[in-house]
Amino acid sequence: MAKIHELSENLTNQIAAGEVIERPASVVKELVENSLDAGATRIRVDFIDAGLKQIVVQDNGTGIARDQVDLAFTRHATSKISNEHDLFKVSTLGFRGEALASISAVSHVEIVTATENAIGIKADFSGGSKKGQEDAASQKGTKITVRDLFFNTPARLKYLRSPRTEIMKIVDIINRLSLGYPHVSFTLSNTGKVLFRTTGNGNLKQTVANVYGRHIAEKMESFEAKDSDFKITGLMSKPELTRSTRNFISILLNGRYIKNFQLNNAIMDGYGSKLAARHYPIVVITIHVDPMLVDVNVHPTKQEVRLSKEKELSRLITDAISDALLDKTEQSSGFANLENKRETLVDQLEFNLNQDVVNTTRKTPEVHEEAEKPEFLVKQEAKNSEEPKNETEHNYVDINIPREDDQYIITKTWDKNVALQQKLMPFSNKKVDQEVISTGDETLANNLPRLAYVGKIDTYLLAENDGDLYLIDQVAARRRLQFEQIYQTITSKKIVQQGLLTPIVLEFGNLDFLQIKDKIYQIKQLGIYLDEFGQNSFIVRSYPTWIHDHVEESIREILDNYLNLDKGKTQNLFKRVAALEAKRSVKGKINLSAAEGTQIITDLRKTSDPYHDADGRLILVRISQNELRKMFKKGE
């Protein structure tokens, strides 16, 4: 066994830095939290090369006295606690006195600081040692510049991720802190280009607009509650506005962003069954509590805390969100009758296929969902089964029905002056069948026998084969057909674009904007072309024809889900997007004719999996002749 010896101060500083400073975002977090503890109302963060080359944090806080600068860079030196009793009632973001010492141990640090009506001071530190000091002109506040992070511990660099990912982690830190301090003005810049700015006017909804985008903030509602120990306030998204991960839930405890599984579950419980499976809300919740009830000294990053009365707090959060949703539901219940009348109108519609036919040519079969607006197109059955298989010309019948909303997307055919709303029945004629079947697995498809259409009950089709009865969920079946068509279109790399008469401008939060930029090539493979258009915005001038008529809403949801997909093969990503659009475009029962029901059954047999939709839900159930006989006790 080697001889035990005491480690050098330089080495111990580097070890300590490893616990606190994991990446550039850790530096930003520690320095900005110091600024907030100093009472700053304006904080500016600039970085270069994802923070590895340089990070600058400047504030208008109280500053550091001249004779305390050296002490500030000493390990376990702090102004925030004085004795062991203070450790159990921490009211500041920092308290260990490790941040500046840890940062200076693995970088070159320059600090310029001044207190009220005092001469400023400039000091330099490198590798944990002081290199120089001089007077400097400075306003009240502190400016810290960190250069060449990990210059003396190069092994740490190999554990960092891509520059884009490191930038997004910095952005996420500032986002969370700005949500906790809406009265503080934050500015974040990358190589001189402003990525993010808040006004600091104290309006949380305005800060949410800065972080997530105005379109998100407009769909969020406030909530609040309190008891003898806790006071909670915040903003919550409506149930229809969700994300595919929990990353958009921000819990701020006395201004500190924390991660807490129990409180996350309390938020989800507040929404109850109003959220779709694997969908999560956007929530910003601020919790005010006596510091005596919180132990923040349980994790190096201080993002995990130990809470007294956690169960009581969880119940308070759940009830507050549930009550807020109940209030909104009662206010909107008056719209239910209008929706029922609209559905009745659609159900009573008799499809007249003898009207004049409007011809248009598309390479991609389009999508139909149950008419949310009662004006749509119905595809006419092909009259000539001997038409060439490589043709993709579709015939449509235009049925005009009074509509509630005159706002819809105009489809522009460049060689004809024809305006059509893009909604049609998702049933392939025989020409398109050849495209669908080419993507399927013949072995699997042939396992489904040829079924004869019998009739329908509500949303279910009835079919039979050799005395066996089959119940087919028409919604799931249509989604499977739609998925096959969309997936084949995307993977064919021959995606037809439809021009927009009026381009769509999509505004995103700063983090989403960076993520989209990072995946712009993969998004183009979907046929979605985005061009930067101002700060945190993209412009869309055309869209792929496999998207149905709610173009902006559809693209937003596709991008949101696409961003949150786990990394994997591009084909798997294509399947997820195709499944999403199939689910969006087919949302309810429609009044099917016998011919249309027969066509669904015929097409279903040609798909890659006729038994499940793209989300794995069951499409059909078989009841054998023997089972039917047993039900009626035949043969006994």
From Swiss-Prot:
Example GO biological process: mismatch repair
Positions of the UniProt region annotated as Disordered: 362-393
CDD domains per the UniProt record, alphabetical: HATPase_MutL-MLH-PMS-like (cd16926), MutL_Trans (cd00782)
Example of a GO cellular component annotation carried by this entry: mismatch repair complex
Keyword Chloroplast listed: no
Family matches, as Gene3D superfamilies: 3.30.230.10, Histidine kinase-like ATPase, C-terminal domain, MutL, C-terminal domain, dimerisation subdomain, MutL, C-terminal domain, regulatory subdomain
Keywords, in A-Z order: DNA damage, DNA repair
Biased composition (Basic and acidic residues): 363-393
Gene Ontology molecular function: ATP binding; ATP hydrolysis activity; ATP-dependent DNA damage sensor activity; mismatched DNA binding
Family listed: Belongs to the DNA mismatch repair MutL/HexB family.
Function noted in UniProt: This protein is involved in the repair of mismatches in DNA. It is required for dam-dependent methyl-directed DNA mismatch repair. May act as a 'molecular matchmaker', a protein that promotes the formation of a stable complex between two or more DNA-binding proteins in an ATP-dependent manner without itself being part of a final effector complex.
UniProt cross-references to NCBIfam families, sorted A to Z: mutl (TIGR00585)
Protein's name in the database: DNA mismatch repair protein MutL
